[in-house]
């Protein structure tokens, strides 16, 4: 009404000064709000943790299992059945030039732990500085049956491990240390002195170690990469919702390898450096036409630095297990010595091609698989070693409970197609090892899970004449 408008006009005139002051405060508040929205994030660090208990048993039912290698304590082969020696060196007989073969028929059950504490620090809200600490005391009993260069491989639960270079010692180590930031809306860069390669490559929904397959051999491609952690950078490009590309260069720097030994942790060793020791260059293309299907194609180039004239073991991929040397006449074992003579190699260069897929056919059933092929050239002798591997499996999500996952997988971790004579350990008697695994992830609640697992190992250490080995593991998993 007209009289109401006149009242409003009179009030505006009477309180003009107050309204002007209020308008100024609102404008100032809007400026401050815009500034806060632009710079809203203060440095924040969040702590998360994972703790595992492992109760593990490995048995051949008292049948002798052959393995290649010499005991770490240097005892003569005839006096060393393998008991108590968890890290073995590869050596050849001085007369025949053949790898030394020993036997063991039992391993004691173990109860161990592993813990990871992760600090995630962000400065802008979009970046992430990751510092992960680890400590554990696990030595899986299956290692008692393993040849040199096979430590923590077949039948060994991934979380049944020690974190540092001293097996069984609960030393605290830096597991991961890297910084990730967006270069654009579609490109992310990760850089650091200890980048975890497996955070960026070779993922599979049914073999992720926290909820899926659970052994060292089954959680990823056995041949894919010689570096677990390394110094360098990773670039990830989400080209489209259906296509992703990732590439990396990493110089080896792994928490469980002893830096005091020349040839390990080469990226921080001035004798080798970031580009002169063990390093890898990786490229992976992921095609995801739907949420149910993923196909990954990978290429990896590796330079493998020799240690004691041998290459292999923890930094041997794409030949995942065993130790290579220059052939008979090298790596000669003398009773009473901890180490064999020089293996005759300086380094090896290697190429790996791999394919990896997972397909959720329905809500309660899926299939997955991997295939890999590796070509290794030994220097300075200029000789070739070729190795292939495969994995095939079934996944049963939400079996008996929402969030649960049962996995059955069959795999061939290493089939030597060329160059057996250059294996100082790992080639066995010409056989090929196979593994069968069944595991079941059962979430008790949001923070606790039980994961029973069973592994059967056929032709262990690539000996056709070896008996089967069976592993039973019960994992209790805590997350916070």
What are these regions (language model features)?
Residues 1-106:
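N-terminal periplasmic/intermembrane-space "pro-region" immediately following the signal or transit peptide
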Residues 44, 50, 56, 101-255, ...:
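Outer membrane beta-barrel
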Residues 63-100, 141-164, 207, 213-214, ...:
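Solvent-exposed loop segments that connect transmembrane elements
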Residues 109-113, 171-175, 227-231, 277-281, ...:
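Residues that define the transmembrane beta-barrel architecture of outer-membrane proteins
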Residues 185-186, 191, 203-357, 370-374:
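Signature for the C-terminal beta-barrel architecture of outer-membrane proteins
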Residues 298-347, 354-358, 368-464:
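Outer membrane beta-barrel transmembrane domains
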Residues 394, 468-480:
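Outer-membrane beta-barrel "beta-signal"
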């Amino acid at each position: 009404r007209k009289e109401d408008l006149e009242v409003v006009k009179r009030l505006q005139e009477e309180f003009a000064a107050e309204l002007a002051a209020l308008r100024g405060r609102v404008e100032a508040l809007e400026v401050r709000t815009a500034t806060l929205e632009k710079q809203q994030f203060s440095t924040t660090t969040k702590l998360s943790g994972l703790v595992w208990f492992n109760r593990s048993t490995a048995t051949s039912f008292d049948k002798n299992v052959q393995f290649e290698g010499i005991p770490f304590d240097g005892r003569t082969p005839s006096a060393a059945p393998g008991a108590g020696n968890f890290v073995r060196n590869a050596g050849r007989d001085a007369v025949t030039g053949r790898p030394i073969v020993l036997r063991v028929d039992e391993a004691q059950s173990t109860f161990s732990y592993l813990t990871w504490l992760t600090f995630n620090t962000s400065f802008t809200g979009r970046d992430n500085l990751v510092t992960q600490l680890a400590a554990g005391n696990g030595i899986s009993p299956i290692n008692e049956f393993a040849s040199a260069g096979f430590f923590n491989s077949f039948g060994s639960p991934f979380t049944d491990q020690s974190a540092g270079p001293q097996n069984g010692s609960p030393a605290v180590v830096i597991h991961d240390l890297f910084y990730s930031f967006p270069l654009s809306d579609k490109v992310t860069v990760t850089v650091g002195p200890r980048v975890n390669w497996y955070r960026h490559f070779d993922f599979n929904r049914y073999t992720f170690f926290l909820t899926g397959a659970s052994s060292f051999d089954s959680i990823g491609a056995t041949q894919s990469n010689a570096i677990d952690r390394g110094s360098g950078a990773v670039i990830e490009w989400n080209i489209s919702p259906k296509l992703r590309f990732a590439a990396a260069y990493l110089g080896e720097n792994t928490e469980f390898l002893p830096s005091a030994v020349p040839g390990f942790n080469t990226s921080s060793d001035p004798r080798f450096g970031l580009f002169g020791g063990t390093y890898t260059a990786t490229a992976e293309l992921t095609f995801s036409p739907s949420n149910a299907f993923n196909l990954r194609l990978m290429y990896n180039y590796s330079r493998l630095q020799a240690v004691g004239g041998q290459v292999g073991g923890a930094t041997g991929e794409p030949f995942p297990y065993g130790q290579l040397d220059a052939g008979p006449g090298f790596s000669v074992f003398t009773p009473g010595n901890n180490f064999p003579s020089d293996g005759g190699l300086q380094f090896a260069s290697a190429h790996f091609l791999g394919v990896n897929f997972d397909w959720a056919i329905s809500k309660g059933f899926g299939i997955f698989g991997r295939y890999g092929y590796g070509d290794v050239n030994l220097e300075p002798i200029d000789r070739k070693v070729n190795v292939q591997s495969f994995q095939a499996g079934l996944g049963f999500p939400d079996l008996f409970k929402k969030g649960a996952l049962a996995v059955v997988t069959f795999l061939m971790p290493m089939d030597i197609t060329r160059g057996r004579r250059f294996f100082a350990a790992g080639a066995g008697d010409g056989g090929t090892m196979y593994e069968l695994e069944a595991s079941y992830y059962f979430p008790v609640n949001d923070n606790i899970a039980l994961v029973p697992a069973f592994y059967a190992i056929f032709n262990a250490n690539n000996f056709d004449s070896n008996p089967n080995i069976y592993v039973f593991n019960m994992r209790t998993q805590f997350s916070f």
